[in-house]
Design a protein with these regions (language model features):
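Two-component system phosphorelay core
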Residues: 1-153
Length: 153
């Protein structure tokens, strides 16, 4: 979608609608909308940076978990650390389905089951992939809004 042709008010409404759609799909919870509202107190770039950092960190953690599970001897303590990091990040941004997928991985880690860890990790990757594209779109939309607001000042 070409955001350049839309006025800022329409862009803001589109952003609110997109967040609502993600909530209806169950990909995010109310906390995601709350994170968006925090830019009022934390500056216009807060939400853009939050999404960018979340996606980058989540990607790295998933890759680290893939490496860990592919080892001949799985370091379940390391898997646990990665799982908690990803679950915490997902919870903080309101990515509830990704957070829930981490809960299943945590159980597999506690059971020290490589097979269950692989299944749970596949679920995590799937949830991340479901979330990535909509968050990328929200990121681009928010970037356009922020750049317009910055050019007004």
């Amino acid at each position: 979608m070409d955001y350049k042709k839309m006025d800022t008010k329409s862009l803001n409404q589109l952003l609110i609608n997109r967040i609502g759609e993600l909530q209806q799909q169950g990909l995010v919870d109310d906390y995601f909308r709350h994170c968006h509202s925090l830019k009022e107190d934390n500056g216009p770039f807060f939400f853009v940076e939050l999404i960018h950092v979340f996606l980058a960190d989540a990607y790295k953690v998933v890759k680290e978990m893939e490496k860990a599970i592919d080892q001949s001897h799985v370091d379940y303590n390391q898997m646990y650390v990665h799982c908690i990091k990803l679950k915490g990040s997902a919870a903080c941004i309101g990515a509830c389905r990704l957070r829930n997928a981490c809960t299943y991985l945590r159980q597999a880690i506690d059971d020290k089951s490589r097979d269950q860890c692989c299944l749970a990790l596949n679920d995590i990757k799937q949830e991340y992939n479901y979330l990535q594209s909509p968050l990328d779109n929200i990121f681009k939309l928010e970037q356009e809004i922020v750049s317009r607001e910055a050019s007004k000042s």
